[in-house]
Every structure is written in C-alpha cells, then in structure tokens.
Amino acid sequence: MSAAPSHIRPATRGDLPEVVDLLNACDIAEIGEPDTTADDVESDWAMEGFELAHDAWVAVGDDEGLVGYSYTGDQFRTGELEADLWMHPEHQEPDLATRLLSRAERRSRELAAERSYEAPMLDIFCIGVNRAKRELLLRHGYVLSRTVYRMTADLSDGVTALPAPEGIAIRPFRVGVDEHVMHDTMSEAFEDHFRQSEEPFDAWKARLLGHADFDPDLWFLAWDRDEAAGALIAYGHGDLGWVKGLGVRRPWRRRGLGGAMLASTFAALAARGRLLVELGVDAEGETQPLRTYERAGMHVTFTYELYAKPLAG
C-alpha cells in the first residue's frame, strides 16, 4: 500500500464495513484468521457515553481506503480509560501509528478532565506477537500492567462433565425475569476484578441483551435455593462460542461451581453445533480462574498484554 501521508478524520457509521475489514486484516496478520465482526465494533461504539464523532478516528490512504483506526472510551468510569489502534499490516507509514495514538490520548485527557478524575490512566491492549505495537507503546511512556490469556476449548470429542456442588441448581436465563439478578450477580462477582465498574443497569441491558447474537439459552444463573450464587454470559456466532463473563459470588467460591457452569454452557453450545469455544481471562486474577478453565478442557492460545500510562500532565 501507499506510503503517502494518510488523512485522519472522525469515524462515521458508514465506515463500519471498512473498519471491520481493516481489523480482520490485522487479525489475519496476528493470529492467522479473521476474528472481528461488525457486532464487535458496534459493541465498542455502544459503550456508555461513547460519541462516535469525537471518540473514534479513521486514517484514509491516497486510494481512499482505510489504512488505520483508533478509538478511546470510558465505559468503566473508574478513572481507567481505554483506547486501541490498528494499522493495515501492508501499509508502510512510520508516523501513522503515533498520530492515531495521539488522537486517542488527547481525547482521553479531555474525558478525564470533564469527569474530574484525580489520577486518570489510559489502558491499551497489545497481543503478544505484535512487537511493533508494543515498542510504540513503550516509546510513548506506557508500562506493562497486566497479562490476559485467550483460551480455547474444542468440543469435538464431547464436553467434560463437571457436576454442580450439592444444593446448587444451574438454570438458563429467563428473559423478563432475571435481568436484574444477572446484572447484580455479575457486578458483585467481579468486584475484585482489576477493571470492575458499576455499569448502570439500563446501559448494561441495552448493550448485552441488545447484542445481535443474544441467546437466553446461553446465559446461566446458579441458584442456591432462591439466591443467585453465580452467573455466566455467553454468545454464539457462526460456529464459534464466546464466553463473555463467568462470575461466582464469594460465599460459593472454591467449590467447583464455575467449572459446572462452564460445562453447562459448553453443552448448550455443542447442541447448537458450536464446537469451538473461546474466552479471555486475567492471568493474575485473585480468584485463579485459569485453573477452572483448564479443568473444563480449555487451553491458552494467545497472550495479550495490557499497557497503561498516566494521563495527568
């Protein structure tokens, strides 16, 4: 692709197909296959408080095609903002990544000032194999703060049976009944998570239940009589299943409940012909979820690094 300086402008909804194509080109270069859908990008654009005209940018090459994309957001409202950037792997323009990063940092500082955060930070993920992005972030003052694993389970040979603890019943989510219970259970279960925030219920409901791949039979609640002990949210897309969140409330931890809920989800996905299941997990999580996922037959396929930078000053 051309090395001529690219024009950076605010993203529009009309850019969605090209943004998806760009991100999939990056996916292929990094992991060998496309891994981004329009729903994934639209989910970013639908985060609480996100304004597309101010919070996302595209870089347009001299052939009018998109060669870069970046965004910033503040969905957690904890003072830890997030951003990311992509460049087409065939596009050679040394300073484009820096220009895209600068847009995201500038907007993040504006958002932090508007919300009066005392010590705002900006977080950016980098897949372990992307050395150029890692070096870019390090040059601009970011430091490694966390490691996250992408894990995969192949269900072709069946689902590992992991029974629920005695007295616990795992049941599918009931639309119109369980929304508040699911929201509250997930919020409490993830209160120790390093990026935990209290997402307002209405925003949470619109984002997750409004997802194009929402299927209530892939969401589960674990019940101890009439009290929710844990929750799991999963989606299916094509032949792939994705576990978006699995949480167990503190009194019910260390009893195998997480694995049992995962097995229920695997069985539901396999029944729909989705034999490959993936999820992301914090490698340093206090609840040691990695062991739960390994017992359920999952293994690490990719490593992602989270880099952080103070926004003050």
Regions picked out by a protein language model, each given a short descriptive name:
Residues 60, 73, 84-96, 246-254, ...:
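A short, internal acetyl-CoA/4′-phosphopantetheine-binding micro-motif in the GNAT/acyltransferase core
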Residues 73-167, 305-309:
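Acyl-donor-binding surface of acyltransferase catalytic domains
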Residues 150-169, 275-287, 296-313:
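C-terminal "cap" of GNAT-fold acetyltransferases
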Residues 1-44, 163-199:
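Short amphipathic alpha-helix that is part of the acyltransferase structural core
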Residues 30-50, 70-78, 193-248:
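A conserved beta-strand-loop-helix scaffold within acyl/acetyltransferase catalytic domains
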Residues 83, 122-124, 243, 277-281:
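Conserved hydrophobic beta-strand within the GNAT/NAT acetyltransferase core sheet
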Residues 93-110, 248, 254-271, 276, ...:
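Conserved acetyl-CoA-binding loop-helix of GNAT-fold acetyltransferases
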